[in-house]
Amino acid sequence: MPVTMSQAFIDNFLGNSPKWFKIAILSFLIINPIVFYINPFVAGWLLVIEFIFTLAMALKCYPLQPGGLLAIQAVAIGMTSPSQVFHEIEANLEVLLLLVFMVAGIYFMKQLLLFGFTKMITKVRSKIVVSLMFCTASAFLSAFLDALTVIAVIIAVAVGFYSIYHKVASGKTFNDDHDHTSDGQKQLCEEELEAFRGFLRNLLMHAGVGTALGGVCTMVGEPQNLIIAAQANWQFAEFAIRMSPVTVPVFFAGIFTCFLVEKFKIFGYGLQLPEAVHKILSDYEAHEDARRTNHDKMKLVVQAFIGIWLIVGLALHLASVGLIGLSVIILATAFNGVTNEHALGKAFEEALPFTALLAVFFAVVAVIIDQQLFAPVIQWALSYEGNTQLVIFYIANGLLSMVSDNVFVGTVYINEVKAALLSGQITRDQFDLLAVAINTGTNLPSVATPNGQAAFLFLLTSAIAPLIRLSYGRMVWMALPYTIVLSIVGVLAIELGGLEQMTQYFYDNQIITHHSIKDVVESAVSSH
């Protein structure tokens, strides 16, 4: 029976996605203009929910296409303007450059990373110890590097492990070419493969949460930290000290949670590395060590020096993150002899689809701003006073960061609080305490969903996610114990007066000094 033109259109639309998903997206495109005509505010929230739905279906269809169609329509019907979308992208150019260049830069340091992490996994047999190592290493690195950079490193390592195992389990040798995305080979043991996928899922989730634990502590850990630090006129050390009454107890609670979920094998954790897989990885390590020439050793040395430059450059903020990433690409390729354009191009394959998706995400953020979707929440939070106000801001930030980008939420809130300070609604000391509540509120509860943490969203839409069956729902479920513990410990640190008392202690001992309103007036406005 010949295919009609309408059937061909439906077949082509969003490719191999399920039919119900195609119908859902077409329905959204029909409903949205009607709702916008009746009530723009409701239409704005509807768009946010629809966009979250496209992210949740990331394994069925990459969110760029359905999310992009919704964003294009939002601009077309007037929910926001092209100039506002461009302004959002402009304001977040550093994040986009980070994705384009830093992730590609990490690609050229893969050999060193695989070398280090393979040793970690093959030499340490205790799953609990390996999990704690991944979580604490990610937290430490995220305090000095950007969380996206760290998660890109861990993803590169996981893809390396997976492809090595898949190649050998499919009956090939380490040196053979192989497509590790295809499970058609007869030799693959399904049970073994599932256990290994589960093991990698565990490590990636521990590492992802680790980036949040470390990222909240310093002003370079997350993009919104830089914005908040600029508005409050804090330097690196002062930022870390002011955050510590909340971040230190939260860090230890997070590490303890990592231990508990592994020990009691709950929320999908506790999956062991199968013995056969461990043998393959150990054999690979021995194989690599045996055939490593002086050329290979020199490459590792060069990559180690570039790694030192990367950490120093980012920790001292010698240039914007994206530009440091570009320098990593240039140094790693120049000194390791990668001069072929095709070989260079491979490095960019992983990050560019996500960069495009993030640009679409900023279009949704533009709608949130133009339709003032968060305005009622902010006004409600400002109606409280004192310590209660800090708790309310922490909770309000946390809830909004679960559904929206935490960079955006943090930026909107700090600018609103700054406006309240300049209009005399709050004191300068209260502003400083609110800045801590906003920073911790945007960083910690946002681990709940991939929407809030860019590192989680990058993990969800990366090449490794479908290979290890890491879906949106599974990420939310595996993040749940961390979400509960981090959110509660964070709110208790503020609620029980720990933040106010410790901040007063820092003032009394002249560890930090009181700031004036003049500092805020003079500070760089990073407003959207």
From Swiss-Prot:
Q: Which InterPro entries match?
A: Na+/H+_antiporter_NhaB
* Pfam families cross-referenced by the UniProt entry: NhaB
A GO CC term? Answer: plasma membrane
**Principal place of residence:** membrane
The answer on whether this UniProt entry bears the keyword Cytoplasm reads no
UniProt keyword Ligase, yes or no: no
The terms under GO molecular function for this entry are: sodium:proton antiporter activity
Disulfide-bonded cysteine pairs: these are: none
> Where does the UniProt annotation place the signal sequence?
none
Superkingdom of source: Bacteria
So what does this one do? Na(+)/H(+) antiporter that extrudes sodium in exchange for external protons.
Spell out the protein name for this chain. Na(+)/H(+) antiporter NhaB
